[in-house]
Regions:
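Conserved, structured C-terminal
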Residues: 1-3, 7-265
């Protein structure tokens, strides 16, 4: 099963459908293609006490030894079958709980009831956006898009050109040979007032545009205004000083190390 964000539903399903139709009949024998987006849901449980909470509502083992980071398992939560993934977008211990949509209210109620004495609180997409920026986590459609190569987006460790042929390998090799025009960086924006970087803000050096912000928000754990940006490689070194336009006003910004919150995980 291929899982992606709901915002990528059309892009992902169209891409898979095209590849499915282009494949030889023998390669697809016995296979079907179905979009399950509307029949599934996902809830995220994240925070230092997320393991403790899940072990209160499931008979499965969520220990670090049994449930490694970046792995998935089929578990139960109450009466619900759940595909749990030990990954999340907020930079804390946590799991994504993928489930049949008809079980969502049951799972949510179990989580909130079990989490009362742990101080559980619901959070939404704006809070998650702030948290992910403090970890320099990249979002599909902003930092990750067809405009940039995986190398420009900081995905080097996920690219293995020597593993054999794959879709895009030839283009990727040509891109590597000619060099890259952009590099993704993390910025601390100084002395912001009532607004932070939102996205598509121009980035300047000596009054010349050298890139654009892809996203930004105030980071409450860091107590700093944080942004991610694509800039010319010569302006991507840690400590480089740049300027960013926020609602027509210029603010100083400094290139900082990736993942400024809990960089050692």
């Amino acid at each position: 099963m291929r899982k992606s964000s709901r915002n990528s539903k059309l892009r992902t399903s169209n891409w898979l459908a095209r590849r499915f139709n282009l494949a030889t009949s023998s390669a697809c024998e016995g296979a079907t293609f179905e979009d399950l987006t509307n029949s599934t849901g996902v809830l995220v449980v994240a925070g230092p006490k997320s393991r403790e909470l899940l072990e209160k509502i499931s008979t499965d083992d969520f220990s670090n030894e049994n449930f490694k980071w970046l792995t998935a398992q089929d578990v139960n939560v109450g009466y619900a079958p759940v595909n749990a993934m030990r990954v999340n977008f907020v930079g804390e211990l946590g799991w994504e709980l993928h489930h049949p949509i008809e079980y969502q209210n049951h799972i949510f109620d179990k989580i909130m009831e079990a989490g009362k004495d742990l101080g559980i609180k619901p959070f939404g997409i704006r809070a998650m956006n702030s948290l992910r920026l403090e970890k320099s986590y990249k979002l599909v459609g902003t930092e990750l898009s067809i405009e940039y190569s995986p190398y420009e987006s900081g995905l080097d460790r996920f690219v293995h050109p020597n593993k054999g042929s794959f879709i895009g390998l030839e283009a990727l090799n040509k891109w590597r040979e000619k060099g890259f025009d952009n590099k993704l960086i993390t910025l601390e924006v100084h002395n912001t007032k009532d607004a932070d970087v939102l996205g598509n803000n121009p980035i300047y050096k000596d009054n010349k545009v050298v890139g654009r912000a892809t996203g930004g928000e105030f980071g409450f754990r860091l107590d700093k205004s944080i942004a991610l940006a694509m800039v010319k490689p010569e302006h991507s070194n840690v400590g480089d000083k740049l300027q960013v336009d926020i609602l027509g006003e210029m603010y100083e910004a400094t290139v900082i190390e990736e993942s400024p919150y809990d960089s050692e995980n």
